[in-house]
Structures are given as structure tokens and as C-alpha cells.
């Protein structure tokens, strides 16, 4: 059987098993990820159908296996090579793919959120992720708030909502719950 240098080209590719056997995709025209020759043809171009053909924005065209995505640009949740990190923790629908710089986590389910510390204790919805400088804690649920060294606390006993972290000079305590109230 003679080799046919110009195999049948079709954009539908997958309509029948016979079409699949003869299918090669012209550049930029591959629409079916099951086309057996979609990635075996040098001229197939950005076919988005298999291992050799990558897409930069993770549109995936129905085939997550073919997709690689730059950070923050994944559009399909099922893409197995989804961006390993996004800078704003939008997470793209997959918390497992997200890491966040300090103070920039927007999704509570981000698994790496607790590893990132914020300096102002706004906590971004997750008290477990927060460390606060003396006198700068504004969220009472911050676990690092009560651990601050009393010597570093303000002397007017503002207490920022948590009395246990405050020390006050005699006659200057403003909060009754302060355990260190003037002795």
C-alpha cells in the first residue's frame, strides 16, 4: 500500500471511526481531543488536543490533560497542570493550587494561607495566619495577640479588645478587664 503524503484533513475529525483513522488536523483547526493523529502531525499547529500541543491560558478545549497554564490564568478547574501559584490567592476554583503573599489571601480555604503572616492583624478572615506587632492587633481572634511580650505593650491599656495582652501604669488603666490593672 502506497504512502499517502496528503492524508484527509477535516475539522470535525471525529464524526466516525473511519474519519478518526484518516484524521490529521490542519494548523489551528483541531477541534476534537480524541483525534488519534491530532498531535502526530508536524503541521497541526496549536491543536490543543494532546501532550505535544499546549495552551497558554488553559482553555483546554475539553481536554484538561493537554493544558499548562501560567500563574493566575487558568480557566478550567479540571486542568491537571493548573498554575502552581497565583499571586492574589483568587485560587481559580482550586484552593490546592494557591499560595499567597502576606496580606494578599482572599480565599479562606487556601491551604497555604496559614503559612503567610500579616503584620497588621487584619487576618483576612483567618486568625490562624496572623502575627501582630505590639499595639497593632485589631482582631480579638488573633492567636498571636495574647502571646506578645507585655513589656512591648502600650502603657495606656487601650488593650485593642484583648485585656490579657496589656500592662498599665498605676492609675492609667482604661479597661476593667485588664489583668495587669494598677497594682
Swiss-Prot record:
GO terms for molecular function: metal ion binding. This is Copper metallothionein 2. Residues 1-35 are annotated as: Cys-rich copper-binding 1. Residues 143-156 are annotated as: Spacer B4. Divided into 5 Cys-rich domains by 4 spacer sequences termed B1-B4. Each cystein-rich domain contains the conserved copper-binding motif Cys-X-Cys-X6-Cys-X-Cys-X4-Cys-X-Cys-X2-Cys. The copper-binding domains together are able to chelate up to 24 copper ions. GO terms for cellular component: cell cortex. Residues 80-88 are annotated as: Spacer B2. It is found in: Cytoplasm, Cell cortex. Disruption phenotype: Fungi lacking both CMT1 and CMT2 whow attenuated virulence and reduced pulmonary colonization in mice. Impairs growth rescue by antioxidants when cells are treated with fluconazole. Residues 36-45 are annotated as: Spacer B1. Belongs to the metallothionein superfamily. Induction: Expression is induced in a dose-dependent manner in response to high concentrations of copper and basal transcription is repressed in the presence of the copper chelator bathocuproin sulphonate (BCS). Expression is regulated by the CUF1 copper-dependent transcription factor. Highly induced during mice pulmonary infection. Keywords: Copper, Cytoplasm, Metal-binding, Metal-thiolate cluster, Repeat. It comes from Cryptococcus neoformans var. grubii serotype A (strain H99 / ATCC 208821 / CBS 10515 / FGSC 9487) (Filobasidiella neoformans var. grubii).
Amino acid at each position: 500500500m502506497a504512502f499517502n503524503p496528503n492524508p484527509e484533513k477535516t475539522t470535525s475529525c471525529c464524526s466516525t471511526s473511519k474519519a478518526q483513522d484518516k484524521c490529521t488536523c490542519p494548523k489551528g483547526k483541531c477541534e476534537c481531543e480524541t483525534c488519534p493523529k491530532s498531535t502526530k502531525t508536524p503541521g497541526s499547529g496549536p491543536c490543543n488536543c494532546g501532550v505535544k500541543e499546549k495552551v497558554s491560558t488553559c482553555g483546554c478545549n475539553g481536554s484538561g490533560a493537554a493544558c499548562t497554564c501560567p500563574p493566575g490564568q487558568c480557566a478550567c478547574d479540571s486542568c491537571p497542570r493548573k498554575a502552581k501559584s497565583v499571586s492574589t490567592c483568587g485560587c481559580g476554583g482550586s484552593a490546592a493550587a494557591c499560595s499567597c503573599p502576606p496580606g494578599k489571601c482572599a480565599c479562606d480555604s487556601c491551604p497555604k494561607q496559614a503559612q503567610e503572616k500579616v503584620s497588621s492583624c487584619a487576618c483576612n478572615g483567618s486568625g490562624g495566619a496572623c502575627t501582630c506587632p505590639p499595639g497593632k492587633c485589631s482582631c480579638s481572634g488573633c492567636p498571636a495577640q495574647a502571646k506578645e511580650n507585655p513589656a512591648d505593650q502600650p502603657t495606656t491599656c487601650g488593650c485593642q479588645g484583648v485585656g490579657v495582652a496589656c500592662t498599665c501604669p498605676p492609675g492609667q488603666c482604661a479597661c476593667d478587664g485588664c489583668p495587669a490593672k494598677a497594682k
